[in-house]
Amino acid sequence: MKSSRRVLLKLACGAMAAAGLGLHRAAALAQKPTFRDADRTRDKIVALVRSFGSDDPRAMRHIQKIEPITEISIPGVTVAPDQLPLMDYFVGDLHLRYSFDNPEFVSSVSAGDLKRLGLKREQLLPLSVENFRRLYPGRKIEYPLPEIALVTDAGDLEPCLMLDAAFWEKESQRRGSAIIAAAPARDVLMFSDRSARGNVDLLKKLTVDVYATVGKEALSKTVFLWNRGRWEAFA
């Protein structure tokens, strides 16, 4: 998350706690994509967390079940099947879009890329988690409110941490409590423990406020529960 955005989020969290104010976020800059295979290597593949943008029950997964989305089309554009972006269902209204990490634009991974790189489809998820850990070893956990942890310094890909099961198992054990988390925007991931009911209510309010203010960068209003090694839609 960009430093100015992080400071703004922290200030807004404090203001909300004191006066019920919402959160604000700087607008993203438009970028003109330039794709080169030399930049599209296996060590840059990550899984972007994205939203279906609706509550269509056909797309919803109340319990995490990561599996390929097979019916993909790009409106108004004719694309060869092996050039379509590779995407997976995730949990709730969230899905995964595999991409080559680039701070300027989304460069989607396709079946053609898998062939070029000698990868199998089932390798994408574990490779993405491994790459995210390696690419952003300096990510931080900050506390804009005592009850709320905020993931920062992860290249605007903070919600990708939701895919790192080892992190959440360790965090749950450290806290001695089940973990609740929310990704209301493409670069915002907040979490807390479920031990106090007030934590759920506070995280939900923050999530709704962020979601309402970030426009096209919004992800989900749902609070998710880490339970038995997977996420569940919780509140």
Q: Where are the model-predicted features located?
A:
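Short amphipathic beta-strand starts and helix->beta connectors
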Residues: 171-178
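Charged, alpha-helical interface segments at or near domain boundaries
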Residues: 32-144, 149, 155
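Flexible, glycine/charged-enriched surface loops at secondary-structure junctions
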Residues: 139-144, 180-181, 217-220
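Short amphipathic alpha-helix segments
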Residues: 159-171
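C-terminal structured domains
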Residues: 197-235
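Short glycine-rich, basic-tinged beta-strand/loop micro-motifs
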Residues: 143-150, 182-193
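N-terminal secretory signal peptides and thylakoid transit peptides that target proteins
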Residues: 1-15
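C-terminal segment of N-terminal export signals and the immediately downstream linker at the start
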Residues: 22-34
